[in-house]
């Protein structure tokens, strides 16, 4: 390769990484601690707002797990790329060695946090690396007496030899979901948006506004319509038979909360002149 395919290695990194998944639902604008949970299998979730994340997970029949998982995240400016030898890393030592080739500062932070948790006997930890374009991580079970280690081994030596489980991270936060479909464009996230009319065009438009970020990250989407969904509307409306004779604004808000959990959508059934937009 002679260093001529570095970009290709970075682009294909996710293919060579882990099969276990971590869903990340974090508002990057808000500093603070992160809560991590595991479903006990090959899926975990990290959030900074349990109520918002619970609404999303409930939609797909999961809900928020009860088993908490200690976690921390380290940011780096280095894009990950596979090594051309000894890949993928299988131990903490191999993972740290790889990180050192990318960003020595990041490696030091990861090792420091792992040692801190190892000393206080944290049983298992999730490590997330926030790098440009992609986030990834590893899970480590912090056993103090792994097979093959003698009593004279230091904590650091024991830590280095522990196996890792590679974790692929997928973002499910509102900002990412809006920006992913509008690369390079400004989204409606964080704005107050009003839509007058939830008929044939308005119903589909309301859904598109939601997918563009309206009603998320502190914003609000207000739908105004005084009419009800009638049988003659069913063949062409975004709403279906379950919304028959319901107020269109209210039914559309309910539908948006179903397809975009966590959205702040409000219905105004009446004259738009009386609405506080």
Per-region residue spans from a language model:
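ADP-ribose/adenylate-binding Rossmann-like module
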Residues: 1, 277
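Glycine/serine-rich phosphate-binding loop and adjoining beta1-alpha1 elements at the start
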Residues: 3-192
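Glycine-rich phosphate-binding loop and adjoining beta1-alpha1-beta2 segment
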Residues: 220-263
């Amino acid at each position: 390769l002679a260093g001529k395919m570095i970009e290709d290695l970075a682009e294909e990194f996710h293919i060579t990484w882990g099969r276990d998944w971590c869903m990340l639902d974090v508002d990057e604008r808000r500093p603070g601690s992160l809560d991590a949970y595991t479903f006990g299998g090959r899926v975990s979730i990290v959030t900074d707002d349990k109520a918002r994340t619970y609404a999303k997970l409930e939609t797909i029949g999961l809900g928020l797990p009860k088993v908490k998982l200690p976690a921390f995240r380290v940011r780096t400016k280095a894009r990950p790329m596979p090594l051309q030898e000894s890949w993928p890393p299988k131990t903490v030592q191999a993972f740290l060695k790889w990180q050192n080739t990318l960003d020595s500062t990041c490696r030091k932070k990861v090792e420091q946090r792992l040692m801190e948790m190892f000393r206080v006997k944290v049983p298992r930890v999730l490590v997330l690396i926030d790098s440009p374009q992609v986030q990834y991580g590893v899970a480590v079970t912090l056993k103090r007496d792994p097979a093959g280690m003698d009593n004279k081994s230091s904590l650091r030596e024991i830590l280095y030899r522990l196996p890792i489980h590679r974790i692929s991270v997928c973002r499910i936060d509102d900002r990412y979901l809006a920006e992913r479909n509008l690369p390079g464009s400004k989204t409606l996230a964080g704005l107050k948006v009003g839509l007058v009319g939830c008929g044939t065009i308005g119903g589909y438009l309301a859904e598109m506004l939601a997918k563009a970020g309206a009603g998320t990250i502190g914003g609000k989407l207000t739908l105004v319509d005084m009419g009800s969904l009638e049988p003659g509307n069913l063949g062409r409306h975004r709403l279906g038979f379950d919304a028959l004779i319901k107020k269109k604004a209210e039914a559309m808000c309910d539908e948006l909360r179903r397809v975009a959990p966590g959205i702040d959508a409000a219905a105004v059934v009446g004259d738009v002149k009386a609405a506080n937009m």
